[in-house]
UniProtKB/Swiss-Prot annotation:
This is DNA-directed RNA polymerase subunit beta'. The keyword Magnesium applies. GO terms for molecular function: DNA binding; DNA-directed RNA polymerase activity; magnesium ion binding; zinc ion binding. DNA-dependent RNA polymerase catalyzes the transcription of DNA into RNA using the four ribonucleoside triphosphates as substrates. Zn(2+) 1 binds at residues 67, 69, 82, 85. Zn(2+) 2 binds at residues 867, 943, 950, 953. HAMAP family: RNApol_bact_RpoC. Pfam families: RNA_pol_Rpb1_1, RNA_pol_Rpb1_2, RNA_pol_Rpb1_3, RNA_pol_Rpb1_4, RNA_pol_Rpb1_5. One of its GO terms (cellular component) is DNA-directed RNA polymerase complex. Binds 1 Mg(2+) ion per subunit. Binds 2 Zn(2+) ions per subunit. The keyword tRNA processing does not apply.
Length: 1496
């Protein structure tokens, strides 16, 4: 494949790259000579052999400016070709560019085009790969021209003949062979590459395309149409590769451009016969080097061996042809040549790959050099090694400013050496470069002074691998230090995810002025305080700093100086320095500004000052008038560093408060002030952490005395569960789940009590509690293990299916302070090892997810300001989500542009105008305005920009709180924002020691807040039963599915919280009841779905037979028989149907209700038993995912969603709104019908035994699942459309990150990725466009194809029109109108036309891997996966890569089209002249118009 013309590829400026199949002429045009010998170098002289694979005559000299024989040496002979050895005198670097060629004795088929799936050659010739293989490898003859003998024998073109058949025809029609080869009467049949070459040459692409399109239109056979379509795709690819090229020729004797005569357009493109090679290109020798080792041996590239095989076999074949060897020997040699060339191009695809002699590994062919992680694309083009860089271990630099890093002198002098040398020579300290180097080597003191001046104002870039997001590389101002380790500021550790246990970092020096400027303005660490993924601060104090600030701002009663009154903060500091007042003393300070406090000072006043005191009344009035402040000395010290505009922070500063404060500072006072504040609180934090002398001792871990009581109670409860199981009222699964629940609850109670115990210890100054409460280190989970009980341990299993046995049901009762027994220690090792193994295994999964995300979104760049769309995304206030800790309404709209006015429905006021950016203040206002239930916001999901996206649809750049700028690479930011937490969280697993978390299946649901109850669709029955103590137990049981309870504000009527009540729940309240917070509303059985009787009557079993549809399991411990429905489908005889169901029959024998019983159900009634409403008939066990707590469980789920995979057992979803009814039953499936009021009916077939959620007569909406199982995203797209599936994917992925990991990712990042998944449409009917049915194309390309034919019409009868007009032709309407006017004038027959048919399509949801491979850019797709396939398809179609994305520009070595690399910035010129400025402005504005429509 030739990428560009000219002797040196890819030099100079180019804007796009075309891929095509190299013709023999283009290979020869690039070649500098033919390689005739297989030798590489002479083993005696070590010089390249003439005409060999390393020949200097062909590829250029091995030494700069010196020919092979040594006649010409030195640069003055540049360009001369030596008359003795024929070598051109030039630089040795040409050996990286100059190519050679091998002329083959016979044509050879290129393996890529023959072995690719589907085979390109096979599609053109309509031959299967197997048949092609037999022809290519000289096993059978193929008929090229049947001629007269063929007609007589009934042989057609492309028929395969054996050797006997071929010779029989040749001998029978001997005279026929004397005819000329061009004579159509001559019988021609050949084998091998030559035959394929002749066949491909004879193909008429236009005629083939017409024939195939006819088959597509007219054939009724599906198979024929599918085959025709497959072939047509390849034919159309070849036809598309033809592009008109303007050619000119010179006048005879003309020399100048004006003497050129334009010729008619010449069509140049891929010809099918180019897939068969007559000439093989030989790549430059420096790209397949031969390196001498010690001991006279050589290391060589595998390609040299592969080329040698080709040359040896080719030369042998030429000799055999010359001596007219027998056909059998020739044929064998030709086959071997074909195999040698196959191995050269793609050795890995063959079963019998060519292997090396010593290590017996397959040789790396040209294809292997391109693909995979070690291939050319990923190893050398996307990831290069960088000069002016170094790496070293990092240590903390607590005295550094936020924008500084400590750079070891020895490292700095190496990195900045050229600059130091220049400065030394300029200042006359050294006479020459050589003497300057000597000064540096001697480490002369003056060198350090010069180095200081050189690095002043020159930032360096620090990078820590793995670079998971853009904050993994930041710029710092270097400070020279002694030692060998790099020092970094403690606050940037979070961004780099660095710690000081031996981590290393790399330093890079930006060289050019522009690079230094960008590093200082964009990448300086003090400008990167906000995380792009969520808009939250990243430079948040941690560990010692937090502990110091927490200790400083905490109050303690009884401290010296408590209750004193101070005039201002200066007085407080003087008193503290004089030791008249304690650090934690509660004091009063006169203050009149803004105060941020969360407590009521009037309540606290009584604890500080005695009510009877004379000061009490005055202080109270001062506090009420807000002229006085009740605070602590420590808080006064802390507030010395807080900017005045923020006010006085009168709170205990823990990590959360610090994070909020830094976020506020960043948006209100800017980065400069925030950076100062951060440096100050770093000093304060470290200082007071040291002053407090906070460390943990064994006595600080306090075990609560109540622990023993709780454990005894839990043991009693679990014994009770076992008794119930023994009585047979519980299944083994339920017993397991309930025991796990008992211990989970107990563990949590003990944890809470031990936490409270720590809190009360030493007035809250217990060091362990302080570390925990401040957020400095540790979690409640770890305190539970230290002072409570270790609790339940997860059994390490890769599957997260929730099968019983995921959690070991015997808990570890001891805690780490008391110490574990041997058995407990042994059980613990499970979890600890799981953590360690997960870390290594799952990191790779997360890294691969990041790579796929990156590849799919890398070309999403903000290209225009506003796409002008009128569509937006509807965001609703969801009460259920907001109270369960999911993303709030304000977070969803923050930083977006309103698509329409947002109204307060209670008073009809406009809260936010359309087109306005929803700032933090506006988002808070919307959240707090009760009347705003929904908002329509601009979103990238609805952006209509043709290339990239527009800044209005994206909204604000989260890291700078401003509308995103044109040129921002938002796709890459999105991929990093999603990938980084995935990787981080897998690494965090092992800190928990593998204890089971989450998992409590809450059986009681309590009211979240006060209010009045309102019921929606709640249908209940009253049920009475006798409990264990013989007392009647009356219960209200819910029998309706998806009923809801709302808690309503009695004054405004606004719904405060909504609960969905599970089927079978016990209600503890009534509609209209007033409820208090934490009052129990209902309780439910979490471990199973219950089938409940809704009417009284007798039970009758249908199709429930022992040993056929259910099995009886007698529990060995209890002797109780449990009846479980089994998978009975395999036991059915032919045409036999069964469906286990339980019917309820009234006294008259009429069936009142039928309940289908799914597989795995446990039966709770006997045949003929009497039941009452509310009785449990059967239970279907539910799988609970109990091992939560880290994203490891969630990562496969995220991958499944991003890959848009269909779940293994998907739910059947209704396609229309309507009512459910059940139809007839076949052998193993039954019908579910949904019929609407308009008579439309849809029928679904459900496997018998699958749990059906809908009942007879239930109303369902389009998109509602009717059976259990996960809903397939493909179904949502098909039924509810693209908007619904986009929302579904974004919400589901957010759930995994939010619930499993508590990670905040802004919706807009997920939207960018989901947008890329829905970019393509599949053509259904091509109409009159040039598209093909089944084509997968960009939505914008589809719209364009339809627009192109919108103004055209189809000619149905050409009438008396000229010959250029044909029936069936598409012409412009105005041209036909003009022609008809002419025809009418001349009284001729008019042209009859009809309107063109538009193409139709449907949207397609692609997984991120498929979407990345379907990208418009060939280079980007090839560097991602399936390199050879992508390049083969691109070459056949003559695809053009317009270099619009980032990846393809990095690969070809150009500036990326993002940020300052945008086209519009490349034309900027700097000038001081105002007239020139106006001219420049005009020139720059002109190309901008073009940019408007096309993005970049």
């Amino acid at each position: 494949m030739i990428f560009s013309q000219g002797a040196s590829p890819l030099k100079g400026d180019f804007s796009r790259i075309k891929f095509s199949i190299a013709s023999p002429e283009s290979i020869l045009a690039h070649s500098r000579g033919e390689v005739l010998k297989p030798e590489t170098i002479n083993y005696r002289t070590f010089k390249p052999e003439r005409d060999g694979l390393m020949c200097e005559k062909i590829f250029g000299p091995t030494k700069d400016w010196e020919c092979y024989c040594g006649k010409y040496k030195r640069v003055r002979y540049k360009g001369i070709i030596c008359d003795r050895c024929g070598v051109e005198v030039t630089t040795k670097s040409v050996r990286r560019e100059r190519m050679g060629h091998i002329s083959l004795a016979v044509p050879v088929v290129h393996t890529w085009f023959f072995r690719s799936v589907p085979s390109k050659i096979g599609a053109l010739l309509d031959l299967s790969t197997k048949e092609l293989e037999r022809i290519i490898y000289y096993e059978v003859y193929v008929v090229i021209n049947p001629g007269e003998p063929g007609e007589k024998q009934g042989i057609k073109k492309l028929d395969r003949l054996t050797e006997e058949q071929y010779f029989q025809i040749i001998t029978e029609y001997e005279d026929n062979q004397d005819l000329d080869d061009t004579d159509s009467a001559k019988f021609v049949a050949k084998m091998g590459g030559e035959a394929i070459h002749m066949l491909l040459k004879s193909i008429d692409l236009n005629e083939t395309a017409v024939t195939l399109r006819k088959v597509l239109r007219e054939s009724s056979s599906e198979q024929k149409r599918a085959d025709a379509l497959k072939r047509l795709k390849v034919v159309e690819s070849f036809r598309k590769s033809y592009e008109p090229q303007k050619k000119t020729r010179k006048k005879p004797g003309g020399l100048f451009p004006e003497d050129e005569i334009p010729e008619p357009y010449v069509y140049e493109g891929n010809k099918p016969e180019y897939m068969v090679m007559e000439v093989v290109p030989v790549i430059p020798p420096e790209l397949r080097p031969l390196v001498p080792l010690e001991g006279g041996r050589f290391a060589t590239s595998d390609l040299n061996d592969l080329y040698r095989r080709v040359i040896i076999r080719n030369n042998r074949l030429k000799k055999l042809i010359d001596i007219r060897a027998p056909e059998v020997i020739l044929r064998n040699e030709k086959r071997m040549l074909q195999e040698a060339v196959d191995a050269l191009f793609d050795n890995s695809r063959k079963a019998n790959a060519v292997k090396t002699g010593e290590s017996n590994r397959p040789l790396k062919s040209l294809s292997d050099a391109l693909k995979g992680k070690q291939g050319r694309f990923r190893q050398n083009l996307l990831g290069k090694r960088v000069d002016y860089s170094g790496r070293s271990v990092i240590v903390v630099g607590p005295e550094l400013k936020l924008h500084e890093c400590g750079l070891p002198k020895s490292m700095a002098i190496e990195l900045f050496q050229p600059f130091v040398i220049r400065r030394l020579v300029e200042r006359g300290i050294a006479k020459s470069v050589k003497s300057a180097k000597k000064l540096i080597d001697k480490k002369d003191p003056i060198v350090w002074d010069v180095l200081e001046k050189v690095i002043d104002g020159r930032p360096v870039l620090l990078n820590r691998a793995p670079t998971l997001h853009r904050l993994g590389i930041q710029a710092f101002q270097p400070v020279l230090i002694e030692g060998k380790a790099i020092q970094i500021h403690p606050l940037v550790c979070t961004a780099f995810n660095a710690d000081f246990d031996g981590d290393q970092m790399a330093v890079h020096v930006p060289l050019s002025q522009e690079a230094q400027l960008e590093a200082s303005l964009l990448m300086l660490s003090s400008h990167n305080l906000i995380l792009p993924q969520s808009g939250k601060p990243v430079t948040v104090p941690s560990q010692d700093m937090v502990l110091g600030m927490y200790y400083l701002t905490k109050s303690r009663s009884g401290e010296e100086g408590e209750g004193r009154i101070f005039y201002d903060s200066e007085d407080v500091l003087i008193a503290y320095n004089e030791q008249r007042v304690g650090l934690h003393a509660q004091i009063f300070v006169c203050f009149n500004g803004l105060v941020d406090q969360k407590f009521d000072p009037l309540r606290v006043l009584e604890t500080v000052i005695d009510e009877k005191s004379e000061k009490y009344g005055w202080l109270r009035s001062q506090l009420e008038q807000k002229k006085m402040l009740l605070t602590t000395v420590g808080r006064v010290i802390f507030n010395q560093h807080v900017p005045e505009s923020i006010g006085f922070i009168n709170r205990v500063i823990d990590k959360k408060v610090a994070k909020e404060l830094i976020g506020r500072l960043s948006s209100e006072v800017g980065n400069v002030e925030t950076a100062k504040f951060l440096d100050n609180i770093k000093e304060v934090g470290f200082h007071y952490a040291m002053k407090g002398g906070l460390s943990v001792g064994l006595s600080d871990a306090i075990v609560p005395e109540t622990k023993v009581r709780h454990i005894k109670s839990a043991q009693k409860d679990s014994t009770k569960v076992v008794k119930e199981y023994n009585r047979g009222t519980l299944t083994d699964n339920e017993r397991y789940n309930q025991i796990v629940d008992v211990w989970q609850k107990t563990s949590n109670i003990v944890a809470e009590e031990s936490y409270q115990k720590l809190k009360k210890d030493r007035d809250g100054f217990n060091p362990l509690y302080m570390m925990l409460d401040s957020g400095a280190r540790g979690s409640r989970e770890q305190v539970r293990q230290l002072t409570g009980m270790r609790g339940l341990i997860a059994r390490p299993q890769k599957s997260m299916s929730g099968q019983p046995g995921e959690i070991i049901e015997n808990p570890i009762i001891s805690n780490l302070k008391e110490g574990l027994t041997v058995l407990e220690y042994f059980i613990s090792t499970h979890g600890a090892r799981k953590g360690l193994s997960d870390t290594s295994l799952k990191t790779a999964d997360a890294g691969y997810l990041t790579r796929r995300l990156h590849d799919v979104a890398q070309d999403v760049i903000v290209t225009i300001d506003d796409c002008g769309t009128t569509r937006g995304l509807h965001v609703y206030r969801n009460i259920e989500e907001e109270t369960s800790g999911q993303i709030k309404f304000r977070e969803k709209i923050r930083g977006r542009v309103a698509a329409r006015d947002i109204y307060d429905t209670l008073n009809n006021n406009v809260v936010v105008k359309a087109g306005e950016i929803i700032t933090d203040e506006l988002a808070d206002l919307v959240q707090d305005t009760a009347g705003v239930e929904e908002a329509e916001i601009r979103s990238v999901l609805t952006c209509e920009s043709k290339v990239g996206i527009c800044s209005k649809c994206y909204g604000t750049n989260l890291s700078v709180h401003k509308l995103v700028e044109i040129g921002e690479a938002v796709g890459v930011i999105a991929a990093q924002s999603i990938g980084e937490p995935g990787t981080q969280l897998t690494l965090r697993t092992f800190h928990q020691g593998g204890t089971a978390q989450g998992g409590i299946s809450e059986t009681e649901t309590k009211a979240f807040n006060e209010g009045v109850l309102e019921f929606e669709d709640v249908k209940t029955v009253e049920h009475s039963s006798i409990n264990e103590d013989g007392v009647e137990d009356l219960r209200t049981i819910v029998i309706q599915k998806n009923g809801k309870i709302n808690i309503v504000d009695p004054e405004s009527g606004k719904v405060l919280k909504r609960y969905v009540i599970p089927h079978g729940a016990h209600l503890h309240c009534r509609p209209g009841n007033a409820v208090k917070k934490d009052q129990v509303l209902f309780s439910s059985e979490p471990n199973s779905t219950q089938i409940i009787a809704e009417t009284p009557g007798s039970v009758r079993f249908a199709d429930i037979e022992k040993g056929v549809t259910y099995k009886e399991e007698v529990d060995p411990q209890t002797g109780f028989a449990q009846h479980t429905i089994i998978n009975w489908r395999s036991k059915l005889r032919a045409n036999e149907t069964r469906e286990p169901r339980i019917m309820i029959i009234d006294a008259s024998g009429e069936i009142r209700k039928t309940y289908p019983v799914p597989i795995k159900s446990n039966l709770y009634v006997e045949d003929g038993q009497k039941v009452l409403p509310g009785d449990i008939i059967a239970k279907v066990p539910r799988n609970l995912d109990r091992v939560g707590g880290d994203i490891t469980a969630g990562l496969p789920k995220v991958t499944e969603l991003f890959e848009a995979r269909i779940p293994s057992d998907p739910a059947i979803v209704s396609e229309i709104d309507g009512y459910v009814s059940f139809g007839s039953q076949r052998r193993s499936s039954k019908e579910i019908k949904v019929k609407n009021d308009f008579g439309e009916e849809k029928i679904y077939y459900v496997q018998v035994g699958k749990h059906v959620l809908a009942n007879e007569g239930d109303e369902v909406k389009a998109g509602d699942p009717m059976t259990d199982g996960a809903v397939s995203p493909q179904d949502i797209l098909r039924i509810q459309g693209p908007n619904a599936v986009q929302q579904y994917l974004v919400n589901e992925i957010q759930k995994v990150y939010q619930i499993n990991a508590g990670v905040e990712i802004n919706d807009k990042h997920l939207e960018v990725i989901v947008r890329q998944m829905l970019q393509k449409v599949r053509v259904e009917e091509p109409g009159d466009t040039e598209l093909l049915p089944g084509d997968l194309i960009d939505r914008s390309a589809f719209i364009e194809a339809n627009e192109n034919i919108a103004e055209k019409v189809r000619v149905t009868d050409k009438g008396d029109a000229p010959a250029r007009i044909q029936d069936g032709q598409l012409c412009k309407m105005r041209d036909i109108a003009k022609l008809n006017r002419e025809l009418r004038k001349n009284s001729k027959k008019l042209v009859v036309i009809e309107p063109t048919l538009q193409a139709t399509s449907h949207p397609v949801l692609l997984g991120i891997t498929s979407a990345a491979l379907q990208t418009e850019s060939v280079i980007s797709a090839a560097s991602f996966q399936e390199t050879t396939k992508v390049l083969t398809d691109a070459a056949v179609a003559g695809k053009i890569d317009n270099l619009l994305g980032l990846k393809e520009n990095v690969i070809v070595g150009k500036l990326i089209p993002a940020g300052t690399g945008l086209k519009r910035y490349r034309t900027i010129r700097l000038t001081g002249d105002t007239q020139k400025q106006a001219a420049v402005a005009e020139a720059v504005a002109a190309p901008d118009k073009e940019i408007e429509g096309h993005g970049i």
